[in-house]
C-alpha cells in the first residue's frame, strides 16, 4: 500500500561533529533509501537541515554565526552547495528532486497554506522527491519555524502523511540525556503525548544544529494530532527507515491520535502564530476542554497582548499552561472591557452588538 513518508535529517546527522564537513556516506545511504522507498510506490518528502552548517564549512568558519545577517548570508552559501550535492546523488539514482524553501508566513496565510499543499501534491504526483528547508536567507525572527523538527511536522500535517521520521544523533528518546546520564531509560513507544509530561528531556542541541529533544517532542505533538505516526531514530543509519515501516520497533514511536484533528483546526493550532493570550477560569476551561463548548467572555480572567479580530490566541489556565488555541471574535481592546462579563452585557458595554462568543467552538482547538 502506498504511504506518504516525511523524513527529516538534522545538521548533526548530515555533518561530521569534529569538522562540520558533510558526512557524504550518510547522505548517500539516505538517498539510496529514499529512492528505494520511491521504487516501492511510496511518496517521499525530505526535510533537510544543514545549510548554515555547510555554509560555515565552505567559508572556513569554526563556529555557527550568531548575528542574523551573517547567519542568513552563510545559509545562502550553504543551501546552494547542499542542494547540488543532493541533486548529484539523486541524478545518479535517476530520481528527480525539487527544492522547496518555506517561511512561516507561507503557512500563516490560509491561501498560501493551501497553495503549498497543492504544490506538494503535484510534485508527489509527478514522482518527485521534494527537498524542503526553511528559507533562512529571508526569514525574519518573528516568522521563523525555529527548527526543522517543527517544519517537518507542519509539512507532514499539511500533506496528511502516514509517517514522519525524525533522524537525529541518538538512537531513540530517553528519560534523560544519555550523553550525560549513563542510566537514562530508553523509551520505545509513546502511546499518548501526556506520557512525556514528567520526563527530563535534554534540551541542548549539538553545536552544529538548533534542535534538541524538546523540539522533537513538540514536533511529534503536532504530527500525531494530524494522524501521522512519528519515529525518532538515529540519522547515521537511514536504512532503518525501511525496517521500521516493515514493522521493526527501532527508535521511539509516537502513536498517532485515533481521530486526527481537522485540517483547518490544525492550521489554527500550529500554522498560525498566536498574537496574545487569554487566561481562563476553571469553569471556562471545563466547558471548552470537557464539553466542547465555545469560549464566552464571562470565563476570561485576563487578556494579554495586542491583537485584532480573527487573530489566533492562546487559551491558558491560571498557571499559564496552554490548553487551547482559537480565532477571536473581538480585538484585545474590546476584550479588556468585556472580560468576565455576561454575553447579554456586551452590546451595552461596547456600544454595538457583537458576537455572543469570544471564540466559537468551530474556531477552537485543544492543544
Swiss-Prot record:
Give EC number(s), comma-separated: 2.7.2.11
Residues that coordinate or bind substrate: 49, 136, 148
- On whether Protein transport is a keyword of this UniProt record, the answer is no
Q: In which pathway does it act?
A: Amino-acid biosynthesis; L-proline biosynthesis; L-glutamate 5-semialdehyde from L-glutamate: step 1/2
InterPro entries listed in its UniProt record: AceGlu_kinase-like_sf, Asp/Glu/Uridylate_kinase, G5K_ProB, Glu/AcGlu_kinase, Glu_5kinase, Glu_5kinase/COase_Synthase, Glutamate_5-kinase_CS, PUA
Q: Does the keyword Amino-acid biosynthesis apply?
A: yes
Matches recorded under Pfam families: AA_kinase, PUA
Q: Name a biological process GO annotation.
A: L-proline biosynthetic process
Q: State the Gene Ontology terms under molecular function.
A: ATP binding; glutamate 5-kinase activity; RNA binding
Catalysed reactions listed for this entry: L-glutamate + ATP = L-glutamyl 5-phosphate + ADP
Q: Which UniProt keywords apply?
A: Amino-acid biosynthesis, ATP-binding, Cytoplasm, Kinase, Nucleotide-binding, Proline biosynthesis, Transferase
The superkingdom of the source organism is: Bacteria
Q: Where is the PUA domain?
A: 275-353
The record's CDD domains line, in alphabetical order, gives: AAK_G5K_ProB, PUA_G5K
Localization (cell): Cytoplasm
UniProt: ATP binding residues: 8, 168-169, 210-216
Q: Give Gene Ontology CC terms.
A: cytosol
Instruction: Cite the NCBIfam families for this sequence.
Output: proB
Q: Which family does it belong to?
A: Belongs to the glutamate 5-kinase family.
What task does this protein carry out?
A: Catalyzes the transfer of a phosphate group to glutamate to form L-glutamate 5-phosphate.
**By what name is this protein known?**
Glutamate 5-kinase
Q: Which organism is it from?
A: Nostoc punctiforme (strain ATCC 29133 / PCC 73102)
Which gene name does the record give? Answer: proB
Amino acid at each position: 500500500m502506498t504511504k506518504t513518508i516525511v523524513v527529516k535529517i538534522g545538521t548533526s546527522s548530515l555533518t561530521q561533529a569534529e569538522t562540520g564537513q558533510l558526512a557524504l556516506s550518510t547522505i548517500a545511504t539516505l538517498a539510496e533509501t529514499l529512492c528505494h522507498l520511491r521504487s516501492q510506490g511510496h511518496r517521499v518528502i525530505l526535510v533537510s537541515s544543514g545549510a548554515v552548517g555547510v555554509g560555515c564549512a565552505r567559508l572556513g568558519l569554526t563556529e555557527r554565526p550568531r548575528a542574523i545577517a551573517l547567519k542568513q548570508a552563510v545559509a545562502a552559501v550553504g543551501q546552494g552547495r547542499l542542494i547540488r550535492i543532493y541533486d548529484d546523488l539523486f541524478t545518479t539514482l535517476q530520481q528527480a528532486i525539487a527544492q522547496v524553501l518555506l517561511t512561516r508566513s507561507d503557512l500563516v496565510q490560509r491561501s498560501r497554506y493551501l497553495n503549498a499543499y497543492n504544490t506538494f501534491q503535484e510534485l508527489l504526483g509527478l514522482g518527485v522527491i521534494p527537498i524542503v528547508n526553511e528559507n533562512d536567507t529571508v526569514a525574519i525572527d518573528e516568522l521563523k519555524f525555529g527548527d526543522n523538527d517543527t517544519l517537518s511536522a507542519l509539512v507532514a500535517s499539511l500533506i496528511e502523511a502516514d509517517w514522519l521520521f525524525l533522524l537525529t544523533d541518538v538512537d531513540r528518546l530517553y528519560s534523560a540525556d544519555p550523553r550525560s546520564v549513563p542510566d537514562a531509560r530508553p523509551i520505545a513507544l509513546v502511546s499518548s503525548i501526556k506520557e512525556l509530561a514528567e520526563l527530563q528531556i535534554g534540551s541542548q542541541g549539538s553545536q552544529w544544529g538548533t534542535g534538541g529533544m524538546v523540539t522533537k517532542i513538540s514536533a511529534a505533538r503536532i504530527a500525531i494530532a494530524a494522524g501521522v505516526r512519528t519515529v525518532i531514530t538515529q540519522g547515521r543509519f537511514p536504512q532503518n527507515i525501511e525496517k521500521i515501516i516493515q514493522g521493526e520497533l527501532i527508535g521511539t514511536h509516537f502513536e498517532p491520535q485515533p481521530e486526527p484533528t481537522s485540517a483547518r483546526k490544525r492550521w489554527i493550532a500550529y500554522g498560525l502564530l498566536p498574537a496574545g493570550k487569554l487566561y481562563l477560569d476553571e469553569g471556562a476551561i471545563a466547558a471548552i476542554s470537557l464539553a466542547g463548548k465555545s469560549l464566552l467572555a464571562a470565563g476570561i480572567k485576563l487578556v494579554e497582548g495586542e491583537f485584532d479580530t480573527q487573530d489566533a490566541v492562546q487559551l491558558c489556565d491560571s498557571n499559564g499552561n496552554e490548553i487551547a488555541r482559537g480565532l477571536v471574535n473581538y480585538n484585545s481592546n474590546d476584550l479588556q472591557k468585556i472580560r468576565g462579563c455576561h454575553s447579554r452585557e456586551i452590546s451595552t458595554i461596547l456600544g454595538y452588538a457583537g458576537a455572543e462568543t469570544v471564540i466559537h467552538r468551530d474556531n477552537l482547538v485543544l492543544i
